Amino acid sequence: MRRKGLKLACLAMALVMLLSGCSTAVDDGRAEGEYQTIELTMAVNGTDTQIDARVADYFAALVEERSGGNVTVAVFPNDQLANGNASRGIEMIASGSTDLAAYATCTLAVIDEKLPVATIPWIFEDYDEAVAVIDSTGKDYYAERLAMKGMTYLGSFHNGFRQLTNSKHEVRTPEDVEHLKIRVPGSVVFMGFFNALGADPTAMNWSEVFTAIQQGTLDGQENGVSITDSSKMYEVQDYLTLWNYSYESDLFIANTEVWESLEPKTQELLAECASEACDWGRETLVNEEAATIEKFKEEGMTVTYLTDEEMAAFEEAVADFKQEMFDYFGADACAAFGIEA
């Protein structure tokens, strides 16, 4: 009887093992093919109406839909996780306190001063040229530099060509820029550019700029049309000069340790959705710019379009500075963005 009972026990165990091998469930109870259940955090510097936050929201919606709700992304605009401090926000994505982020290259300069090479003045003619260069050799440069800081590059989208607004007077010549107190990101490119024009550039957190202009601490700011609109600069600035002096990308990034801890299937999903969100962001920003400029006019801003001769005068005024930037970033970095240094 004992021998017969032992045989029955072995048979039952074998049957359990056979059935478990044929089950559609994985070890953690998920059905085969389901995504892991995880919530990720994503930080952006802009307000919820700015392009970086909109791209992040678009990305989060794609991820949740395609994962069946298993993978979710909580988006935090205004660098809420870092109390509005962009530099601290970047430290958090680098350390893994935040999982995902999107920051402009000039903002990322706090951890790698060689990242914003593509912001050197007047190196791209238009958005199409910028995309062609970045999506060929530029992205490899970004990926390599970010990897050294513990971050994984997932894509880029337009922050926009930077324009100039101020509350003092119309700007048509280099002399018009002299002595203007202009807010710039803390980047060697922007600080140096406005110094070369004789302005008084000041680095300041973006969240403080509107009030500083309102109070007269600043005369103006330089940024893309989209950010200028979403921040309602038309309420405190009377003049806009369209000069496309610098192209800026936002880089979509993940903390590398967090990224490598994810299942391959989840990585594939996030990479796919990030790529689509970046494409959407590029298209959206370009499509909205013309209407936004018309809105500025309706709000009472004087919008100035520079002639070719006026543009040439600005380029001549900063020619020596541009060469300094070519030398600063180096031949390899410049070559990655099609710059003949």
Give, region by region, the residue ranges found by the protein language model.
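Bacterial N-terminal signal peptides that target proteins for export
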Residues: 1-9
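N-terminal secretory/targeting leader peptides
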Residues: 23-127, 147-148, 152-341
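C-terminal motif of bacterial Sec signal peptides marking the signal peptidase cleavage site
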Residues: 17-21
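A gly/proline- and charged-residue-enriched helix-loop-helix capping module
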Residues: 125-145
